[in-house]
């Protein structure tokens, strides 16, 4: 959900250095930003941040004269880590961590989509401030990244999802937020194509070119509950049985229980277990349609431009739905019917055939 904010900073001339979970390294490889894995102990985390700051100072003499660190996390520990490393931080004020922030930002007074919250908190880095800590104003670098803006008034978009409304953050007016966009590496695409070959989903044409056959990706896995209700749509097995006669269905479970569930509950699907995250993203991008719960792969599918049918139950869609130009949101209490989802899947498949 942070991708719109990261690209916004990139387009404002920032040379990003990202620090986060290990899985972010392969996932963001196509963005060309250095990604550093956050260590486990306080000493190691502070050492990493100090080292990054030291390296950046050799390239940027004004690094210490302005805000230089954006905290997209809400944790107390992330603010403490950055403060101990001597960084000038901007982040949301909460849980007593405002004392450690150079520029604490007040929490939004109204609920916002998480992507919009990230977008708003980065505002001080992309607009001048009167206290001498102005963000850099270098011209944005040339970029091949598309800049597709969702509607800024919160009305439903043509694909059935709702775009977040731009809201005024403290001391600046947030510009319209871009869609999340995740580019893929050539290596990830090649690895995905190899897996599709192995699954019989690539056809050689008369002119020697390879053609990927239409397939659907189902993401029936969702961990945890919300207000005591499962976030996993119970209609996935039935949907899979109805789709298999029409086109191949691909499942990409994680290790352990998910793999067992995939092979037990979806015997007619083609299961690829343990797929690396960047290759997973490429397989989603090549699909005719993706059907997902409220789960990370749903957001991933939207970010790589896949046609996503997002099936939600108890999730607060206004805050956590997947965003993208090809996202169709289906939500009903307690859950949508299989026929309703299948109808939207057919529409997505028809749109894929037209391209």
Model region roles, listed by residue range:
Residues 1-355:
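Catalytic machinery of carbohydrate-active enzymes
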């Amino acid at each position: 959900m942070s991708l719109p904010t990261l690209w916004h900073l990139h387009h404002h001339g920032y040379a990003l250095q990202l620090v986060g979970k290990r899985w972010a390294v392969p996932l963001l490889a196509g963005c060309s930003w250095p990604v550093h894995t956050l260590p486990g102990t306080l000493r190691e985390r502070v050492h990493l941040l100090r080292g990054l700051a030291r390296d950046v100072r050799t390239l940027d003499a004004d690094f210490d004269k302005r805000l230089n660190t954006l905290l997209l996390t809400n944790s107390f520990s992330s603010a403490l880590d950055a403060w101990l490393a001597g960084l000038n931080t901007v982040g949301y004020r909460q849980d007593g961590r405002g004392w450690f922030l150079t520029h604490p930002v007040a929490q939004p007074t109204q609920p916002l989509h998480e992507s919009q919250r990230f977008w708003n908190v980065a505002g001080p880095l992309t607009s001048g401030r009167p206290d001498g800590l102005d963000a850099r104003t270098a011209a944005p670098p040339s970029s091949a990244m598309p800049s597709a803006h969702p509607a800024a008034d919160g009305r439903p978009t043509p694909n059935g999802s709702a775009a977040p409304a731009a809201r005024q953050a403290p001391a600046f007016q947030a510009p319209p937020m871009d869609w999340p966009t995740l580019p893929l590496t050539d290596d990830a695409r090649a690895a995905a194509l190899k897996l599709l070959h192995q699954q019989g989903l690539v056809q050689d044409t008369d002119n020697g070119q390879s053609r990927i056959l239409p397939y659907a990706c189902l993401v029936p896995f969702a961990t945890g509950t919300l207000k005591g209700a499962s976030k996993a749509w119970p209609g996935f097995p039935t949907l899979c049985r109805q789709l298999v006669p029409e086109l191949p269905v691909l499942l990409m479970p994680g290790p352990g229980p998910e793999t067992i569930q995939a092979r037990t509950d979806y015997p007619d699907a083609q299961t690829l277990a343990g797929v690396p995250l960047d290759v997973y993203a490429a397989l989603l991008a090549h699909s005719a349609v993706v059907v997902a719960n409220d789960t990370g792969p749903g957001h991933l599918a939207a970010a790589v431009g896949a046609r996503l049918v997002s099936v939600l139950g108890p999730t607060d869609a206004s805050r956590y739905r997947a965003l993208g130009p090809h996202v169709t949101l289906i939500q009903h209490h307690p859950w949508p019917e299989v026929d309703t989802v299948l109808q939207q899947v057919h529409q997505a498949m028809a749109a894929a055939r037209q391209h």
